[in-house]
Design a protein with these regions (language model features):
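Catalytic Walker B motif of ABC-type/P-loop ATPase nucleotide-binding domains
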Residues: 170-173
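H-loop/switch region of ABC-family ATPase nucleotide-binding domains
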Residues: 206-207
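Conserved ABC ATPase signature
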Residues: 145-149, 153
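Helical segment within the ABC ATPase nucleotide-binding domain
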Residues: 185-197
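Helix-to-loop junction immediately C-terminal to a conserved catalytic motif
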Residues: 65
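Conserved signature/switch motifs of ABC ATPase nucleotide-binding domains
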Residues: 165
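Conserved ABC ATPase "signature" region
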Residues: 125-141
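C-terminal boundary and immediately downstream tail of ABC-type ATPase nucleotide-binding domains
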Residues: 234-252
């Protein structure tokens, strides 16, 4: 049976981008991975999901654009069951950035054009330059290849490639865990700008509590497949759940 988290953040239904109800997953051995997840993700905010390894954070993220199909539970996007949406259109609206960037052969410009080209849409050079700028990359990257750039720069190229599909939502699964502090700050700055200037909804899984405190509007603490706390970042010290308190203490 799912447990009700300490809800310090009240999100009206009209302001919810994602409405998630009774999301459940069990392992092959029958052990619960997600235990009836209920949560609402507000429009135009950065939501951080934190918790111990194996608590189900990435599984929740993958359910939001159907990279994982839950056997039980429902996910609504703007009031519509995502199972009723064309999966390719869903993944255009709900872009995802992974921990390790994977770039295709060819130039950086070729990478950025890839998604729109699959839909028969041409991206002009000017549009590529704008997308590079959105990802905090200058025009010199246009004709470079993946072998000529750093991992941090490759992650920003992957972000620009995702933004080329004009998503309404960005899902990020530990996008800075392999990056140095400067590259991490670059990514964080880009995410905050996307929220502020484009009112983009961003859902980010991270093991770094400090990172979530820096950029998130709302924090969800996930423990053993259950959301046990939903708090504002500055209120993390007021968490009540024993497992959440232990995780926060060890992560400090």
């Amino acid at each position: 049976m799912s447990q009700e988290p300490l809800l310090v953040v009240d999100i009206p239904a009209s302001e919810s981008k994602f409405h998630i109800r009774d999301l459940t997953k069990v392992s092959d051995s029958g052990a619960p991975i997600l235990n009836g997840i209920n949560m609402d993700i507000p429009k135009g905010m950065i939501v951080g999901i934190i918790g111990p390894s194996g608590s189900g954070k990435s599984t929740v993220l993958r359910a939001l654009n159907r990279l994982w199909e839950p056997p039980s539970g429902t996910v609504f996007l703007d009031g519509r069951d995502i199972r009723d949406l064309d999966v390719l259109n869903l993944r255009r609206k709900v872009g995802m950035l992974f921990q390790t960037p994977v770039l295709f052969e060819g130039t950086i410009a070729d990478n950025i054009r890839y998604g729109p080209q699959l839909r028969g849409k041409k991206i002009s050079d000017d549009e590529v330059y704008k997308l590079l700028s959105l990802a905090d990359l200058d025009s010199s990257f246009f004709n470079k290849t993946s072998g000529e750039i750093s991992v941090g720069q490759a992650q920003r190229v992957a972000l620009a490639r995702t933004l080329a599909n004009e998503p309404e939502v960005l899902l990020l699964d530990e996008p800075t865990s392999a990056l140095d502090p400067i590259a991490t700050q670059n990514i964080e700055d880009v995410l905050v700008k996307l929220k502020q200037k484009q009112e983009m909804t961003i859902v980010m899984v991270s093991h770094s509590i400090k990172q979530i405190q820096r950029i998130a509007d709302i924090v969800c603490l996930l423990v053993n497949g259950v959301i046990v706390e939903v708090l504002k970042p500055h209120m993390l010290s007021e968490a009540k759940h024993p497992m959440a308190l232990r995780f926060l203490e060890l992560s400090a």
